[in-house]
Amino acid sequence: MATLSDGLFDDMSVLGVIGYVLEQTRFIFLVPILKRLVNLCQVVSVLLFVDAAYMAIVVAIVKLLGRTPQKVLKWESFKSDDIELAPSSNHPMVLIQIPIFNEKEVCQLSIGAACKLSWPLDRMIIQVLDDSTEEESQKLVRLECKKWESEGITIKSEVRGGFREGFKAGALTAGMKHSYVDEYKCEFVVIFDADFQPEPDFLERTVPFLVHNPEIALVQAGWKYGNADECCMTRIQEMSLNYHFAVEQKSGSSILGFFGFNGTAGVWRIKALNEAEGWKDRTIVEDMDLAVRAYLRGSKFVYVDDVKVKNELPSSFQAYRFQQHRWSCGPANLFKKIAMEIIKNQNVSLWKKVYLIYNFFFLRKIVVHIFTFVFYCVILPATVIFPEIEVPKWTTIYIPATITILNAIATPKSFYLILYWILFENVMAMHRSIGTLIGLLETSRVKEWIVTQKLGESNNLRENLIFPDHYSFPERLRWREIMVGMYLFICGYYDFVFGRTYLYVYLFLQSIAFFVVGVGYVGMPVPSTPVQTSE
């Protein structure tokens, strides 16, 4: 074996030696490592495809056979179509909880919609759980509650005095502890977030499932969005959420009677909620935590896709990013805390345990986020610099195209936005990956809770917030997105000059997407200091 003393590098410059070392490093270390990573990503890609295909097939079969919840389960409306003529004794006692935290733009909407529900007035209690610290928000809530109380509605405004222990879970728990909940013998509890506006017949269409099917613990309604057409970002959110409800929630409800509770627009059987030990604030996804624990005790859930509740999508990127952090960090952290509980549980079958651990948590809450960013934004771009590594088309084109089409079908009107959806979702995958890792590693932001900013239906408010004077260009810059965009652009340029494929087309487009987000030109530019409380 040649050494330096043999004269191998005698005629080489320093740059030549460095080049030789780099070339050897490339062949001995980088190429083998990258090949293994590509192979691993191919396996993960197949697993995600199988899971997506499974859910799509289930939904297709359910639709073809017409197996709606009303046909599969016992469902009977209450005796009289006229709520004023129907004996109130036919209707169970319902508690409606509306947790609020400094949401003055929307709180009146949700309170008003809840008070207009078609249900005997003596058979429902509306409980406004106001943890607000802003005086204006507190005043609006008090006035709205007094207004409806004067019209004969049983409505309670409960304030914890700025002591927001446990965030939303803490507020819901505190609400259940009030003596009148037991005195009125409430059987079911409905949760609406502050921006949710149910239709008057919401209870009439959901509660019968619980009344006539004692094994059902939760009825989850779908969502519809009042501001979906506000900007491209809200349209993309609508596409993702429509897929979540139409495919993920519906398939879980149809096969196993399980899905993750969405935290709002749902009706719980109070007995089942209490048997599952109620709300816990150990993570920032108290809704999913409760759903898993209730399911492990034998409860079943039903998703009713023909009942939808209007709400508002976050229209600024900042608000959306904070929301996605909570939705990615929380499930990963919950998985870490509850995995052993699932394994040791004796009430559910092995198949259900596998589904919870592998499909529900591992694939859909952890792997999908990390894989999407790492493969499509890190590993795949790197392969253009290593021509020795070939990535098959089924990994880069066929599988992702199929999964993308399955997502887009849920929102036909936005199908033409499919390219924007792909590029934006890859950008968001970076934030979701960070959130997932924070949840798994339990770093400092693991209990970070930032209320998603909503603007309500005030056009004046929206106009005033669109282009504020203090929102300068440097304030918009997001350096993580810019750095990833530069990496993708460099890889794309290298492939354009030296490559033999057309991967540079994707790389240039994806780099542009990262740059656009990086300079703050996505969503409605509504800068503000977010309301944040973290432990």
Curated annotation (Swiss-Prot):
Reactions mediated catalytically: GDP-mannose + (glucomannan)n = GDP + (glucomannan)n+1
Enzyme Commission identifier(s): 2.4.1.32
Organism: Arabidopsis thaliana (Mouse-ear cress)
Residue spans crossing the bilayer: 42-62, 366-386, 403-423, 482-502, 503-523
Protein name: Probable glucomannan 4-beta-mannosyltransferase 14
Residues that bind substrate: D193, D195
Topology of this chain in the membrane: Multi-pass membrane protein
One GO molecular-function entry: glucomannan 4-beta-mannosyltransferase activity
Any one cellular-component term (Gene Ontology): Golgi membrane
Subcellular location: Golgi apparatus membrane
Keywords assigned: Cell wall biogenesis/degradation, Glycosyltransferase, Golgi apparatus, Membrane, Transferase, Transmembrane, Transmembrane helix
Active site annotation, chain numbering: D131, D287
Any single Pfam family the record assigns to this protein: Glyco_trans_2_3
Chain's gene name: CSLA14
Class of the enzyme per the UniProt entry, highest EC level: transferase
